[in-house]
């Protein structure tokens, strides 16, 4: 059932991300080293950890579907923490909104006639879906709406599968690079440290792009590797993709730390659980929580160091 026939969109989410991405000054950022190939990134030592790429593939299998003449929703794998949707109309400006049980609304641009993957980041519960076509300016009309109530049994699914913002496949150069970087790792923390070190020393901040990027921008992780530069969203997408391909559940989060816009990555580590803000971008620099501390501290001490979450106010999770 349609909730509203006409809505007005503002680019609040992208403004939050892009405001963050355009912060900082060139003199605060060291020059990046030249990107290495995945083969060059490999070390002689072979670690104890299995570094075989683990790339989950979302499926629009057609078991459970909904739709109309312009929109198709595949809800066959809600239990895995994602849904798939495609727009088959002729309008060139189409928005998709997904509101979860926490009442946070995610707004996406629909960019393809193929099925695209969207994570159910708010967990199990009622989700409202709505697709809107542009009428004029910022005015959009509802062309499809639907309520779904997924029971997500694979709670790591939303943070292991690719999606619009974190897009990778087994053939991605970034996935091959992650496997090479992880070859010498003994545990997940070694992989996190290796990925962080590589990306922050081989990718430089693109100030020109930060000033000109438009609403609807989606990262291209292999493009970031090839160019050796990107904005904070490119950094985050690249690192999350690499870690997920190594079977490390990782969240890309955007929100506030205190009064400041921040982007941070949180990863799930055995014995410690979710480590919030293991990598963080403050508008100028990326920083990494000391992995030695995380590895050697008790769960209680680690949680005390990280805090109870009150310092972080997450707005969106991808």
Regions found by a protein language model. Name each.
Residues 2-187, 274-275, 311-318:
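N-terminal accessory/pre-domain segments preceding catalytic cores
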Residues 71-75, 208-213, 232-233:
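Short N-terminal helix-initiation segments at or just after the protein's N-terminus
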Residues 162-227, 275, 283-295, 302-318:
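Secondary-structure boundary elements
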Residues 191-195, 228-243:
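Active-site nucleophilic cysteine motif
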Residues 234-318:
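Hydrophobic/aromatic-rich core segments of domains that either
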């Amino acid at each position: 059932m349609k909730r509203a026939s006409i809505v007005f969109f503002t680019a609040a989410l992208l403004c939050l991300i892009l405001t963050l991405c355009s912060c900082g000054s060139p003199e605060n950022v060291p020059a990046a080293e030249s990107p290495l190939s995945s083969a060059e990134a490999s070390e002689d030592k072979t670690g104890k950890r299995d570094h075989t790429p683990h790339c989950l593939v979302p499926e629009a299998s057609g078991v459970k579907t909904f739709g109309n003449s312009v929109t198709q929703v595949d809800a066959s794998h809600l239990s895995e923490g994602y849904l798939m949707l495609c727009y088959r109309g002729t309008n060139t400006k189409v928005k998709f909104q997904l509101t979860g049980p926490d009442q946070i609304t995610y707004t996406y641009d629909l960019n393809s006639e193929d099925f695209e993957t969207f994570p159910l980041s708010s967990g199990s519960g009622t989700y409202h879906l709505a697709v809107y076509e542009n009428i004029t300016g910022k005015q959009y009309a509802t062309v499809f709406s639907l309520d779904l109530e997924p029971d997500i049994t694979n709670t790591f699914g939303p943070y292991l599968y690719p999606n619009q913002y974190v897009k990778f496949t087994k053939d991605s150069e970034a996935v091959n690079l992650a496997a090479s970087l992880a070859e010498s790792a003994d545990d997940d923390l070694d992989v996190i440290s290796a990925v962080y070190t590589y990306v922050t020393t081989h990718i430089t901040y693109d100030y020109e792009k930060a000033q000109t990027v438009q609403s609807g921008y989606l990262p291209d992780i292999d493009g970031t590797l090839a160019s050796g530069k990107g904005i904070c969203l490119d950094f985050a997408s690249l690192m999350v993709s690499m870690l997920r391909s190594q079977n490390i559940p990782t969240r890309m989060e955007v929100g506030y730390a205190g009064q400041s816009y921040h982007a941070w990555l949180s990863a799930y580590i055995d014995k410690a659980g979710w480590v919030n803000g293991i990598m963080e971008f403050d508008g100028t620099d990326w920083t990494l929580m000391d992995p030695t501390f995380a590895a050697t501290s008790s769960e209680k001490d680690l949680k005390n160091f990280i805090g109870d979450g009150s310092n972080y106010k997450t707005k969106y999770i991808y």
